[in-house]
Amino acid sequence: MNDLIALPEISHVLPMEVLAVFNNFFTAELTTLGKSGYPVTWPVLPVFWPEHQKFFIFTPAGLSQKTVNIRRDPHVSMLFSEPTGSDLERPLAVLVQGLAEAPDRMHTSISYLDPELLAVVTAQTRKLMRRQPAMKLYLFNPVSRYLMDWYFMRLMITVTPHRILWWQAGDFSRSPQIMEVDHVV
C-alpha cells in the first residue's frame, strides 16, 4: 500500500492497487436510483480517465433506462468486485460513489471523443478484444451493425467520484479504507 499516485485537481493520493482495479477490471456494477427511489443495478464497462478524474460509460440508446434514472437523480455508485479476466491476484474490491451526467446527445461513432479519451477507450477495446475475440464478429460485421444499430448508437455517461472505498482482497467482512474526493460539489 506504499505505492501512491498523485491525482491532478485533487489534494489526495490514490493507492496504486485502486488504480490497478480501475485499469484492469472489465466490468463494474453501476447503481442508480429508479423512479420509486429504489436502487437499480446494471453491469457496465467503465473507462477511467485519470487525467480528468472521471469515469465514462457508453450505454446503448436502446438500453437507456440508466440515463433516465441519472437525469432524475445524479447520485450513483459503481462497485468493482468481479476481477475475472483482470490478471490481478487477490485485488481490492472498490466502490466509487459520485455524481453522474447523462446528456441526451446520441453518438454513432467514437470519433467525437477528445483524442486523449479516445486513446483510453481504444486501449480498453483492444484489451477486451484480446480477452473476447468473438467480439470482432459483431463489431466489424456490417450485417450485425445494420441489424443491431440501436446497440451501436451510444449515450455517454460521465461519473465524477466524490468518495472511494476499498476492501483488501475483496473482503467485505473487513472495514473499508475511505477516501473523500473534494472536487465534487
Describe each model-derived feature in a short phrase:
Residues M1-I10, E89-V185:
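Charged, gly/pro-rich active-site loop segments
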Residues F25-G62, V68-I70, S77-S81, R90-L95:
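Short beta-strand segments
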Residues G34-Y38, S86, D149-Y151:
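A short beta-turn/loop motif at secondary-structure boundaries
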Residues L63-Q65, S173-R174:
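Short, surface-exposed beta-strand-loop junctions and turns on beta-sheet-rich folds
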Residues P60-S64, D73-G85, A134-S144:
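Short acidic (Asp/Glu) patches
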Residues N2-E29:
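Short, basic/aromatic recognition patches
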